[in-house]
Curated annotation (Swiss-Prot):
<dbReference type="InterPro" id="IPR024079">
    <property type="entry name" value="MetalloPept_cat_dom_sf"/>
</dbReference>
<keyword id="KW-0482">Metalloprotease</keyword>
<keyword id="KW-0862">Zinc</keyword>
<feature type="disulfide bond">
    <location>
        <begin position="978"/>
        <end position="1009"/>
    </location>
</feature>
<feature type="glycosylation site" description="N-linked (GlcNAc...) asparagine">
    <location>
        <position position="70"/>
    </location>
</feature>
<feature type="domain" description="TSP type-1 6">
    <location>
        <begin position="966"/>
        <end position="1015"/>
    </location>
</feature>
<feature type="disulfide bond">
    <location>
        <begin position="942"/>
        <end position="947"/>
    </location>
</feature>
<dbReference type="GO" id="GO:0004222">
    <property type="term" value="F:metalloendopeptidase activity"/>
</dbReference>
<dbReference type="GO" id="GO:0006508">
    <property type="term" value="P:proteolysis"/>
</dbReference>
<feature type="disulfide bond">
    <location>
        <begin position="769"/>
        <end position="805"/>
    </location>
</feature>
<dbReference type="Pfam" id="PF25379">
    <property type="entry name" value="Adt-1"/>
</dbReference>
<keyword id="KW-1015">Disulfide bond</keyword>
<keyword id="KW-0378">Hydrolase</keyword>
<feature type="signal peptide">
    <location>
        <begin position="1"/>
        <end position="17"/>
    </location>
</feature>
<feature type="propeptide">
    <location>
        <begin position="18"/>
        <end position="163"/>
    </location>
</feature>
<feature type="disulfide bond">
    <location>
        <begin position="829"/>
        <end position="860"/>
    </location>
</feature>
<feature type="binding site">
    <location>
        <position position="365"/>
    </location>
    <ligand>
        <name>Zn(2+)</name>
    </ligand>
</feature>
Length: 1020
């Protein structure tokens, strides 16, 4: 039976009469804006709710923007909250309260229609939520209570407003703090921060099970203070309702038809920080600097002793920013962070209802979604700018999402398919929480592993109902904790009720004991740990060669984590899904170097994406082992000499050389193992299968086609064009069928176009200043467009403008001390360097703590230059004072000083012994080369006394000549930066010898460079 609360009809009217009375807080609460000028187009409505007899909302009706909405609603609390959710409130003394979600109301609902989707909450009798209708987001929100009397037609439900989510006047377009530039510096400092590009071709995603994000929600002190000042004693309840309302609206966005597969968010921990922990203190992140606060929060949630969630989100009361004077962003997350304990974290402002849209976007980043631009239109959820109609997921987002899930499944570590939750028993009606979770378990849930109840004296045991104490050990630090849960043992035949220790009545309840009590019967499923299947067969006739110089042929076997799949919190399989047996050391038909292969791929990406930033070239990043088997494409350098890259998800072919006796397999660089016969990861044993290794051409083997690539963009938007796709053969030239495929597209007639010739688009907004304070630079951009509004490349002038900017003097936080004095010149004659330092009085400081400048004390009398010292030789004696030496080389002539030096070593007295006893020689090492003159070595140890003779021995090996017919140089690498910023300097480049044998010529090349004449007046 339905009970309609209003019979008066569906009412709507303009609410402008209210607005003059709204202060800044009212505007923020209702519309998420700061000024009256930013208020979007809106209407006042009187929604009509219908309730079941049990009090749950069943249906909602209202009229908005000349359309009637009739929403049938389903409750969602059971989906939003785990049955074992832990609710924690911490105060400044690390105490607080602990609960299991019993106080959370079921006041959140979803509507699923053919074209209309909605997330509605009515926790305080007022309607709040979003309706997604035909590409638009309509927000329903109550007016502030203290303005309700201004409505002449207000009902008992209170006055409500409805408005469309759109770009507001003055609202910053770039609300997201994620930076997706890949620089050479970021590769060096943090390889895990590489941001991959979109349009990655992968296999169709296999939906093995539901995808559930077990979520930990944290609320910081600033947001708690905001709710506390506004709601007083109701702050806890209001904050919980508000948080779940946000998540309810985020959830509906991930349940849309365009989100495939759907993603379910389930809260397993909700923690309010009424006092900010020291690790998150404001001065550590410049009071809301987005990147700094996110970094601190990621470390904080990772280091918590209690951690059983897939992702952590912090709702903050800070107006987060990029730096001094910048308040343009509202959220930030780690790209690809989901399931990575150090990076599975999101920071979002929580002061108004727009947090639901920000959270949706940022959580998308965590599951691999990049910004849509420039490859998809700016009209979807993952657009880098706010705007109307951004309620669906783009093709770019779904490709990123699917590829991310495939990577997780491929590693066997997809946390979204298994639960991290420990086996928590549900609390039945006749068992109280304190009987299921005894005092020790309560301490552990509140503070983490290792914490237990500090047992009080027997005469004061009943005090735990008011305040229970927890500590790490009998000698550890004691922490003021929380009142014990209802039903906790507090003395013989006593338990806690309403904060007091009272006798157990024995009526319909299980008697409390000091021991942990659990129901005998439980519906918890048993834990199933994942286990590897057997290896697939190694088929030597399918030996694959990739046509790249220096590669080897491989026969690959695979396995899956399916015997059984992990379930119910069971652990994943550990290790790799692939291994390979060597079947050819010298693949025939090799026609290109690794860098040539990479450049071909990068040119293909440049053509497919029509991206002028790509140079069409790339090179292997051998200095980063984790990236040596990935295809990185160079991006044009606009400033300085730092190289930038983009990664499009391509791996180098299996068998490609990635170092000395190291080769690629599934994008990983692995060393030859198992007597140089196999590529296996660290956890695997050597395969029993072997293949006859051949050095002949691989043309005797049949190749296999890979999957088709994505279709290219159509060559025309109308009037008939064509598009292409291609596929690769595992053995070049050994597959039947065509490598390329072409089809007609955009065959419809073109409309008449008045514009003639290409023209520039309007300039973008100036981007953010390069520094947070002081003087820096900023840029803006524009695109060259054809009459059909597609990208063109022949517009006159430049597509970028740069200007200086000044963010004002730097604030007191992060002030540099004065510079110290200059050091002495690093050389006594010729070019050298002076260095001086300064100290940051308080972090963070912009700029460098070191400054260098050139010096030249005197002209050297000769042109000789010493090399660096070699390593010290081994000591001549193991005890009793020996000697060791080192040497250096003179480049040129007339170097001043000695070419060698000695020093004493092992000066300790020798143990008394009548015999000097050598141990046996070790076995000979492998020869240092496979052909040509090499060296092998062996060693022995002096067991007693001071043994005469050497402890190591060398011998010549492999003195046969190398065959040079297959040795060939790869292309030269890039020139290094000039060693001097002005005056004469040196730059270098290097190339690699591929194949067997030695290449003729030099591996390294250097040349002099002179960027500009030094201005000594300015320099000194």
């Amino acid at each position: 039976m339905l009970l309609p609360l209003l019979i008066s009809g569906l009412l709507f009217r303009n609410a402008d009469a209210f607005l003059p009375f709204f202060n800044e807080d009212d505007l923020k609460y209702t519309f998420g804006v700061d000024t009256h000028a930013e208020v979007p187009n809106h209407e006042e409505i009187d929604p009509v709710p219908y309730y079941h007899q049990n009090g749950s909302l069943h249906k909602l009706e209202f009229m908005a923007f000349n359309k009637k909405y009739n929403l049938s609603l389903e409750p969602t609390l059971a989906k939003l909250l785990s049955s074992g959710v832990t609710v924690v409130k911490k105060n400044e003394k690390k105490g607080g309260s602990l609960d299991f979600g019993s106080t959370l109301d079921s006041c959140h609902y979803h509507h699923y229609g053919e074209k209309v989707y909605a997330a509605i909450s009515n926790c305080d009798g007022r309607i709040k939520g979003t309706v997604i209708d035909d590409g638009e987001i309509i927000v329903v929100h109550p007016f502030p209570d203290h303005h309700a009397h201004r409505s002449k037609r207000a009902t008992e439900n209170g006055a409500h407003v409805v408005y469309k989510r759109e770009t507001l006047a003055g609202e910053p377009k770039d609300f997201c703090g994620l930076d997706n530039v890949v620089t050479e510096e970021s590769l060096v400092e943090d390889e895990s921060a590489i941001f991959e590009d979109v349009f990655v071709t992968g296999q169709r995603l296999t939906q093995q099970s539901d995808l559930i994000v077990e979520l930990a929600v944290f609320v910081d002190e600033n947001l708690w203070r905001h709710f506390s000042s506004k709601h007083g004693g109701m702050a806890d309840r209001k904050l919980q309702d508000y948080t779940l309302t946000l998540l309810n609206n985020i959830q509906i966005m991930y349940y849309q038809p365009t989100a495939s597969p759907p993603l379910t968010f389930r809260v397993i921990r909700y923690e309010v920080l009424t006092r900010q922990p020291s690790a998150l203190a404001g001065y550590l992140h410049n009071h809301g600097n987005a990147q700094m606060y996110l970094d601190r929060f990621c470390r904080y949630q990772r280091n918590l002793a209690v951690r059983d969630w897939d992702h952590a989100i912090m709702l903050t009361g800070y107006d987060i920013h990029r730096g001094a004077g910048s308040r343009s962003i509202s959220g930030i997350a780690r790209l690809d962070g989901m399931c990575d304990p150090w990076n599975t974290c999101t920071l979002a402002e929580g002061l108004d209802f727009t947090s639901a849209f920000i959270g949706t976007h940022e959580l998308g980043h965590s599951v691999g979604m990049r910004h849509d631009e420039p490859y998809c239109q700016s009209k979807h959820i993952m657009s880098s700018s706010l705007g109307p109609g951004k309620v669906t997921w783009s093709t770019c987002s779904l490709r990123d999402y699917h590829q991310f899930l495939q990577r997780l499944d491929g590693r066997g570590k997809n946390c979204l398919r298994v639960s991290n939750m420990p086996n928590k028993l549900e609390i039945s009606s006749n068992v109280k929480p304190g009987q299921i979770y005894d005092a020790n378990l309560q301490c552990e849930l509140m503070h983490g592993n290792g914490y237990q109840q500090v047992t009080p004296r027997q005469d004061s045991y009943d005090g735990i109902c008011y305040m229970m104490w927890c500590g790490q050990s009998s000698f550890g630090r004691i922490i003021t904790s929380h009142p014990a849960l209802e039903g906790t043992f507090c003395g013989p035949s006593k338990w806690c009720q309403l904060g007091r220790c009272v006798p157990w009545t024995g009526t319909n309840e299980i008697q409390p004991t000091v021991q942990h009590v659990a129901p005998v019967v439980t519906t918890l499923p048993s834990r199933i740990d994942g286990s590897w299947s057997g290896w697939g067969a190694t088929i030597c006739s399918q030996c694959t060669c990739n046509g790249i110089l220096g590669s080897v042929g491989l026969a690959i076997a695979r396995r899956t984590c399916s015997a059984p799949y992990p379930a119910n919190g069971g652990s994943d399989c550990v290790g790799s899904t692939s291994r390979a047996v060597l079947c050819s050391r010298q693949c025939g038909r090799a026609s290109k170097s690794v860098d040539e292969y990479i450049s071909d791929k990068c040119m293909e990406q440049k053509r497919l994406k029509n991206d002028r930033e790509l140079t069409g070239k790339g090179s292997q990043l051998n200095r980063f082992p984790q990236r040596a088997c990935k295809v990185f494409c160079d991006v044009q350098q606009h400033y300085g000499s730092q190289r930038n890259y983009r990664f499009f998800g391509d791996n180098l072919p299996d068998g490609t050389s990635c170092g000395y006796d190291r080769y690629c397999l599934d994008g990983e660089c692995l060393a030859l193992n198992c007597n140089n016969n196999a590529l296996i990861s660290r956890d695997q044993s050597c395969p029993t299968d072997t293949c006859p290794i051949t050095d002949q051409s691989s043309s005797v083997y049949r190749g296999q086609w890979g999957t088709w690539s994505l279709w290219t963009s159509c060559t025309a938007t109308c009037g008939g064009g064509y598009r292409k796709r291609n596929r690769a053969c595992s053995i070049t030239g050994q597959c039947e069928g065509n490598e390329d495929e072409t089809e007609v597209c955009s065959s419809e007639s073109c409309p008449s176009v008045l514009r003639v010739g290409n023209e520039w688009s309007t300039w973008t907004e100036w981007n953010h200043c390069s520094v947070s304070c002081g003087r820096g630079s900023q840029a803006r951009y524009r695109k060259c467009l054809s009459p059909h509004r597609t990208l063109a490349f022949d517009c006159p002038e430049k597509n970028i403008e740069v200007r200086s900017c000044d963010n004002g003097p730097c604030n007191a936080i992060g002030v540099w001390g004065t510079w110290g004095g200059w050091s002495t010149c690093s050389t006594s004659c010729g070019p050298g360097t002076l260095v001086r330092q300064r100290t940051c009085n308080r972090e963070p400081c912009d700029g460098s703590a070191h400054e260098r400048r050139s010096c030249n004390v005197a002209t050297c009398q000769n042109d000789g230059i010493w090399s660096l010292w070699n390593e010290w030789s081994d000591c001549s004696r193991v005890c009793g004072k020996g000697l060791r030496s080192r040497s250096r080389s003179c480049f040129g002539s007339g170097c001043m000083g000695a070419s060698s030096e000695q020093q004493f070593c092992n000066e300790q007295a020798c143990a008394s012994s009548s015999a000097n006893d050598w141990g046996t020689w070790s076995g000979w090492s492998q020869c240092s080369v496979s052909c040509g003159a090499g060296v092998k070595r062996r060693t022995r140890t002096c067991r007693t006394g001071n043994c005469p003779g050497n402890y190591k021995e060398s011998a010549i090996c492999n003195d046969r000549d190398c065959e040079n017919k297959n040795a060939a140089w790869g292309g030269w690498g890039y020139w290094s930066s000039c060693s001097e910023t002005c005056g004469d300097g040196v730059r270098k480049r290097v190339r690699k010898c591929y194949g067997s044998g030695n290449c003729d010529g030099q591996q390294y090349e250097k040349q002099y460079c002179n960027l500009r004449v030094c201005d000594f007046r300015r320099k000194f």
